[in-house]
A protein has these predicted regions:
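An acidic-aromatic pocket/loop used at catalytic or ligand-binding sites
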Residues: 2-6, 13-141
Length: 141
């Protein structure tokens, strides 16, 4: 009987520890995203509409992410150039593309690899229906 109680107690402590460390890791990641200069950057000709963050609900929450929504009438390449220049000035690197409408960059942080995705095609939002450009922060697994 004593062995079963000890095993159960150990399992409960381990589960609680895993849950708490996972939650605190997401909180630290969210804090890093919010403090990154790109999270509050503005650019002439690119209007910021608002942002949304991933929810930590449920037993297995999605990867930590934050998306900023914009509208712009600038040519696509000029929009990319303005945002990517600011990103490079703030420690982002390893730029690559995924088709003509998506750019990626990454940087290493104390919580792992963080990535930004600049896009005209990803993530549409009912809350910001006029958005035609997004900047998404996410952590690589």
């Amino acid at each position: 009987m004593h062995h079963r109680v000890t095993t159960t107690a150990t399992a409960l402590v381990l589960c609680a520890w895993l849950l708490l460390t996972g939650c605190s890791a997401q909180a630290r990641q969210r804090d890093l995203m919010r403090k990154d200069p790109l999270a509050s950057a503005t650019w002439e000709g690119i209007e910021f509409l608002g942002s949304m963050e991933s929810e930590d609900d449920g037993p297995k929450p999605p990867p930590t992410s934050m998306t900023r929504f914009f509208t712009t009438d600038l040519p696509l390449e000029e929009t990319f150039d303005r945002m990517l220049t600011t990103a490079k000035q703030n420690g982002w690197g390893n730029e690559y593309t995924n088709g003509p409408e998506v750019r990626f960059m990454s940087k290493n942080t104390s919580e792992g690899g963080m990535r930004i995705i600049l896009s005209t095609t990803l993530i549409r939002c009912e809350q910001y229906p006029t958005a035609n450009f997004t900047l998404t922060f996410t952590f690589s697994w």
